[in-house]
Amino acid sequence: MTRREMKILVEVSHTSGHDVRTGIQAVVRGLLSGLRLARMNFQTVRWSRWRNAFVPLDRYRNQALGISDLSERDRCPNEIDRVWLLLPEVIYGPKLLRMIAYARQQRMRIAAIFHDAIPVTHPELVRREARKFHSAYMTALGDVDLIVAVSDSAAEQFRLYHEKRLGRVPTIYVCPSSGELAGEERAAAKPNAIPDTVNILCVSTLEPRKNHQTLLQAFELASSVVSHPKLYLHLVGDRYKDADHIVELVLAATRRNPNIAWYGKITDHRLIRLYRESDFTIYPSTIEGFGLAISQSLWNRRPCICANYGAMAEIAKDGGCLTVDVGDAAKLSDAIVALATSLDLRQKLAKEIDNRPLKTWQVYATEICRQFEAVD
C-alpha cells in the first residue's frame, strides 16, 4: 500500500489544548513533526462529545502543536483506501470507548502508542486519576489493531496484563521514541578541557517515581567530597498533581544550597540552551515506560547517569550512559563524582554517543507508518 492510499487521523485532544511538557506530550509533538517531514497523509483531530465524532483541529491548535504549515494536500488527500486512527495520548474515561466504537463504525484501523503500565503495577507512585482509570484504559486498548510500545519493558507489561485478564493480545510493535527536540539544533559536544565548574542537568517532572529526594541527597554527598570543580545541579520539570511534597522538597534544597536551581516548566528553546551548558545529565527515575530524558540527553551529546535496570537500561545498553542503582544515594553520589572529576570518562561516554544510532522523529514516524502497512 502506498502512502497516498492511506490517511492517518492523529487524536491529540489533550496536547493541543494544554501547554504541558511531559514526556508523552513531547512524543506527541515529535510524532507530528515526523509525520509532516515524512510527508505522510495525516490530519490532527480531537474528539467532539457533542457530535460524537472526530473533528479536525483548527489552525490555532495546529499552530500550538508546531504544524500550522500543513498543506491542504497533506490534510485532505483525494483518494484514500485505508484510514488509520492513531492514539498517541493516554485517554481516561468513557471517551476512549466512544472513539474506538466510532472508528470501527467508520471501518478505520486503530493503533495506540502504549507508554507504560506504571499506574497498574505501582499505583502508589501516581496521581489518583491514574490509579483509578489506567486499568480500564489498558483494557480498552485490547480492542485496537496495533499497539506501538515505547520499549520492550512496556510491551511486556502490556502483554502480561492482557494475557492474565483477557487472553487476547493485539499485535505489539516496539518502537522507541526519538530524543530529538523538534525544531531545535542538536547540541555540540563539550570542549575537551577541564572546567572549573560542572553543570549537571536533570529533566524530570516532580513526581514520586522520579526519585528527586535520593538525587538531592546524592548531590549533597558529592558536593561535600568534591572541592574542584564546583558542582551545580539544574532541575527542569513541572509540578505533578498530588505531589506538592516533592515541590517543597526541591524548594527547600534550593534554599539550603545556592548551587541547586529549579526552573519548572520551560520551552524547548531554553531546554536546549541548558543542554549546551551542561556537562552531563542525571535521570534518577526508579521506573519508566521508556525514559525520554535519557534519549534527549544522548541526542544532545551529553552522557547520562541513569538506572541499571528496566527501560532505562534498554536505552543505556548501546552506550553513552553510566548506569547505577539509583535507589542508593551513596552509589548515585559515586557516579556523580566519577563523571564530574574524570574528563576521560566523560569523553569515553561522549564517543559512545557518537558511535550509537539515534533516530529522528521523521524516522520514528516513518517506522510506525511502515508497520501500519505491514498490518494491512
Which role does the model predict for each range below?
Residues 1-376:
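Carbohydrate transferase catalytic cores enriched for Leloir-type hexosyltransferases
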